[in-house]
Amino acid sequence: MTVDLYNYVATVENFPEPGVNFRDISPLMGDGVAYKQAVDAIADFAKDLNVDLIAGPESRGFIVGSPLAYALNIGFVPARKGGKLPRAAVSAAYSLEYGGENVLEIHQDAIKPGQRVLIVDDLLATGGTINATREIIEKLGGIVAGVAFIIELTDLHGREKIMQNGREVPFLTLMTY
């Protein structure tokens, strides 16, 4: 059975600030059929990329990436917020969508040189989180094989920021707003 994933996204107006329509995938994750359909669609995309690992930024990248890695029988690499990892890590800073700056980190032994990595997240907004994750993967010698999202907010131009300067990679979005 195939479902319309758009029916499983709640829109919360004026959150987290006035004028913003927050796209909440909690209903999608709460429905087994919709959640499986989303993960399976990304898994089909990943199979064509011959990936070795899935990476996802904290926190909703974990929700997408973990079942995806399981479905593909490969490892998952969490990109954690700064200061959360207990061992030596590589980091990258990025700007937050609503102002400010943050840092992501990945353990320095999580990705071996030459490993092909698919970066996944629930939602693409400005591209900052994904570019920071990409920067760390490349510092570790990994190859970003592609990126995938459940939702893309097209008016924030995150796709263009990810692909800028000749850095095109295979790209999948299941829904756009």
Curated annotation (Swiss-Prot):
It catalyses: AMP + diphosphate = 5-phospho-alpha-D-ribose 1-diphosphate + adenine. Gene3D superfamilies: 3.40.50.2020. Keywords: Cytoplasm, Glycosyltransferase, Purine salvage, Transferase. InterPro entries: Ade_phspho_trans, PRibTrfase_dom, PRTase-like, UPRTase/APRTase. This is Adenine phosphoribosyltransferase. Catalyzes a salvage reaction resulting in the formation of AMP, that is energically less costly than de novo synthesis. GO terms for cellular component: cytoplasm. Belongs to the purine/pyrimidine phosphoribosyltransferase family. Pfam families: Pribosyltran. Homodimer. Its EC number is 2.4.2.7. It comes from Leuconostoc citreum (strain KM20). One of its GO terms (molecular function) is AMP binding. GO terms for biological process: adenine salvage; AMP salvage; purine ribonucleoside salvage. It is found in: Cytoplasm. Its main location: cytoplasm. Pathway: Purine metabolism; AMP biosynthesis via salvage pathway; AMP from adenine: step 1/1.
